[in-house]
């Protein structure tokens, strides 16, 4: 499907349209200006040039594949009906129906995208045996089917495969009917009668997609805007539900809400309003397209007033179909911070675009993840063969989010983790391998004791133990977690196998930097006062008495933490680079006009401007924070060369390195207690304080719009249009590193 500009004129609804969308009145009924239309043409041309639309031939191939899958499941159900002794009439009437959902159903899929598909079958055809065993075997024997991978234990059980090269995610729902009609109305609540919760989740993918299209004023404008923002999210590294960011349905719901608030806006306007709204949204107030409805069927719906677990959701985005659920329960404190920064980045770029100071390409600039941090966790995944690696990687990736949550939990939210959704493969290695990475940074604006240490050896052990409990584990499957310094990152994570010349990190920060004249510098521009940047000054101190790798052990829990010294530690890892964090940051709320008060109070993050961080490693990593930059350092020690053990495919490889170190303290510091291994807790059980999980308090515990209750009126219209967002100013502090034995 291609896009053009022919719909800009006649497709807009009338300005005084009587139909209302959403749970609040629109923020603006304004239509596009001539400048908006011009920018919209440029945006759509950019999306086409970027190859985001598939050809007509590819569209026809997808339709043919869906027709073929429909034939297969119909034959499968008839075969089972006959084998189970039903009458000839029942065999003749036996039926299964295929529905699509996700990006394909919403019309925003691109070339090579998978097709989210749901098979609805009769009550006597079950998921556990009939779908995941019998249908699986039928598909496995077909030449058209490749990379068949069942995931029966997923939150939404799914069978993944490629059919004639097109990726398919096939779900199954057995409803309480002996015969499934071909014209089944899946949006009716009656399909949910007498089904289990996995079936409800499977059915709701289609039900949510249909509801979204019904709840937006103009679905063509919605589709273009969503296609644009999904592409932006992938470029900025925040498109992944499994790692704690947002997936396709989350982005669709966020875009749909903006379409409701600006019903007459075209895509170029909606993209701008998207960033304007969500940089000012008061999380954890929920985003909802319609009111949450109860039903006599009795399924639990999202309601933080009644459900204790719902109060710990940080970024609730509620699905519009019964039973209404939070589609973004995976979001953690760390990933919410990253997404908030990226929203600010997008908002600043859009302000520049509207002033004709930037082009659309600036919005979609790739986020340089491997230049953003000094510390990274590397998670290496290995398996015996390609099929095992596919299954093992999917399992480890699904648990990767838990590592983020556990680190937040065990450091009381003082260490933030930025998981990178993309996987990386070292093609130079002969064994089957892939790797994921996570950036590490001390949380901004958190209080803490001087030189505090955080022990996460037990955290890493706990993560590895949970991962190794994989139900379908096979010999050869293994996972390794290690710290790497930025300049020790493996070459295969960089384009063409080599890192590009170092640039000022201000070019990669979301939101750019504010100069003295008030102008904002984005990627591609350099703030003069930060133009000169020192090279990495971190040094390392290695003592040679323990050259070999050893398994990490969880430290004993301590009830008292020293006010002078404490740290962060991970187990059996190579040396880790120093962590850097921005100093004090303050985002002021935008002042609206006199007709209304603030749209929202933006969070103020206060932190020590002179903080300095150090990592210490003894087959472990230790992050140390000192608030006084003038604190005297210990003397520099230059040891002899020593063997540092690196993990390669489960084997040890000795690497001779000459390392130096600057020590911050002459004595070992007590460690913050770590959680013992073997605990398997949900995010809701991590014990975050209510102040962190629900900072808005009772007053805003359940606000329908996410905005201040006194602002839910038409007086917001002019205020939103006149708001001026300010970019946050960040700088980076020096940090040191040392190795302990």
UniProtKB/Swiss-Prot annotation:
EC number: 2.7.7.19
Cysteine pairs bridged by disulfides in the record: none
Motif Nuclear localization signal mapped to chain: 485-492
UniProt site positions, description: Interaction with RNA: 160, 330, 401, 406, 598
Region (Disordered): 494-556, 683-741
Residues where Mg(2+) 2 binds: 114, 116, 169
Cofactor(s) required, per the database record: Mg(2+); Mn(2+)
Official protein name in the record: Nuclear poly(A) polymerase 4
Function: Essential protein. Polymerase that creates the 3'-poly(A) tail of mRNA's. Also required for the endoribonucleolytic cleavage reaction at some polyadenylation sites. May acquire specificity through interaction with a cleavage and polyadenylation specificity factor (CPSF) at its C-terminus.
Catalytic reaction annotation: RNA(n) + ATP = RNA(n)-3'-adenine ribonucleotide + diphosphate
InterPro entries xrefs: NT_sf (IPR043519), NuclTrfase_I-like_C (IPR011068), PolA_pol_cen_dom (IPR007012), PolA_pol_NTPase (IPR048840), PolA_pol_RNA-bd_dom (IPR007010), PolyA_polymerase (IPR014492)
GO biological process: mRNA processing; RNA 3'-end processing
Keywords for this protein: ATP-binding, Magnesium, Metal-binding, mRNA processing, Nucleotide-binding, Nucleotidyltransferase, Nucleus, Transferase
Family: Belongs to the poly(A) polymerase family.
Compositional bias ranges of the Basic and acidic residues kind: 534-551, 721-731
Tissue distribution: Mostly expressed in flowers (very active in pollen, sepals, styles, and stigmas), cotyledons and hypocotyls, and, to a lower extent, in roots (confined to the vascular tissue in the radicle) and leaves (in the vascular tissue and leaf petioles). Barely detected in stems. Active in the primary and secondary root systems.
Binding, Mg(2+) 1: 114, 116
Binding site for ATP: 101-103, 113-116, 169, 230, 239, 248-249
Loss of function: phenotype: Lethal.
Compartment(s): Nucleus
């Amino acid at each position: 499907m291609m896009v053009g500009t022919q719909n800009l004129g006649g497709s807009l609804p009338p300005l005084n349209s009587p139909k209302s969308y959403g749970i609040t009145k629109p923020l603006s009924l304004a239509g596009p200006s001539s400048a908006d239309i011009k920018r919209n043409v440029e945006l759509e041309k950019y999306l086409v040039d970027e190859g985001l639309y598939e050809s007509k031939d590819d569209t026809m191939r997808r339709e043919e594949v869906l027709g073929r899958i429909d034939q297969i499941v119909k034959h499968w159900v008839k075969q089972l009906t006959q084998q189970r002794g039903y009458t000839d009439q029942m065999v003749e009437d036996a039926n299964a129906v295929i529905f699509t959902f996700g990006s394909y159903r919403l019309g925003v899929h691109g070339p090579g995208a998978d097709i989210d598909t749901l098979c609805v079958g009769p009550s006597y055809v079950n998921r556990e045996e009939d779908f995941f065993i019998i249908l699986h075997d039928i598909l496995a024997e077909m030449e058209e089917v490749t990379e068949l991978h069942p995931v029966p234990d997923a939150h939404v059980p799914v069978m993944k495969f490629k059919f004639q090269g097109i990726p398919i995610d096939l779900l199954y729902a057995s409803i309480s009917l002996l015969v499934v009609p071909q014209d089944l109305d899946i949006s009716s609540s009656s399909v949910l009668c007498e089904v289990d919760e996995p079936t409800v989740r499977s059915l709701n993918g289609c039900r949510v997609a249909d509801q979204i299209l019904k709840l937006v004023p103009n679905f063509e404008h919605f589709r273009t805007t969503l296609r644009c923002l999904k592409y932006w999210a992938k470029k900025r590294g925040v498109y992944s539900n499994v790692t704690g960011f947002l997936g396709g349905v989350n982005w669709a719901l966020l875009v749909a809400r903006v379409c409701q608030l600006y019903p007459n806006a075209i895509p170029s306007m909606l993209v701008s309003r998207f960033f304007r709204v969500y940089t000012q949204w008061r999380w954890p107030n929920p985003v909802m397209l319609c009111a949450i409805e109860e039903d006599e069927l009795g399924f639990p719906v999202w309601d933080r007033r009644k459900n204790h677990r719902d109060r710990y959701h940080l970024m609730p985005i509620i699905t519009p179909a019964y039973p209404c659920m939070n589609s973004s329960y995976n979001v953690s404190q760390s990933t919410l911070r990253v997404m908030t920064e990226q929203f600010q980045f997008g908002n600043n770029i859009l302000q520049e675009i509207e002033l004709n100071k930037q082009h659309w390409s600036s919005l979609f600039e790739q986020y340089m993840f491997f230049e953003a941090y000094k510390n990274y966790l590397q998670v290496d995944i290995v398996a015996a063969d390609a099929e095992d690696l596919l299954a093992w990687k999917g399992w480890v990736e699904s648990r990767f989010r838990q590592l983020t949550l556990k680190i937040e939990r065990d450091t009381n939210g003082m260490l933030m983790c930025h998981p990178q959704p993309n996987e990386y493969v070292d093609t130079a290695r002969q064994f089957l391998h892939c790797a994921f990475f996570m950036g590490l940074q001390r949380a901004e604006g958190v209080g803490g004791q001087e030189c505090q240490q955080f022990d996460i050896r037990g955290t890493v052990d706990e993560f590895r133990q949970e991962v190794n409990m994989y139900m379908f584990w096979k010999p050869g499957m293994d996972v390794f977690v290690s710290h790497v310094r930025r300049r020790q990152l493996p070459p295969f994570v960089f384009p063409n196998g080599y890192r590009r010349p170092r640039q000022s990190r201000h070019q990669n920060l979301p939101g750019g930097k504010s100069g003295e004249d008030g102008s904002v510098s984005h990627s591609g521009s350099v703030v003069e006062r930060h133009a000169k940047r020192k090279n990495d000054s971190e040094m390392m101190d290695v003592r040679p008495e323990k050259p070999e790798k050893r398994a990490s052990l969880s430290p004993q829990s301590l009830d008292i933490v020293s006010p002078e010294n404490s740290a962060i530690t991970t187990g059996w890892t190579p040396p880790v680079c120093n962590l850097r964090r921005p100093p004090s940051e303050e985002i002021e709320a935008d002042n609206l006009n006199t007709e209304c008060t603030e749209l929202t109070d933006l969070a103020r993050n206060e932190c020590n401007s002179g903080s300095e961080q150090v990592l210490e490693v003894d087959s472990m990593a230790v992050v140390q924070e000192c608030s006084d930059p003038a604190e005297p350092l210990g003397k520099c020690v230059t040891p002899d060369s020593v063997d540092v053990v690196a993990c390669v495919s489960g084997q040890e490889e000795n690497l001779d390195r000459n390392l130096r170190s600057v020590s911050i303290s002459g004595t070992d510091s007590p460690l913050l207690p770590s959680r013992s291994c073997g605990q398997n807790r949900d995010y809701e059980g991590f014990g975050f304080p209510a102040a962190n999980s629900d900072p808005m308090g009772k007053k805003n515990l359940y606000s329908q719009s996410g905005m201040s209750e006194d602002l839910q009126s038409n007086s917001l219209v002019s205020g939103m249009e006149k708001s001026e967002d300010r970019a946050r100013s960040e700088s980076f502090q020096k940090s040191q590193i040392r190795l302990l034995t």
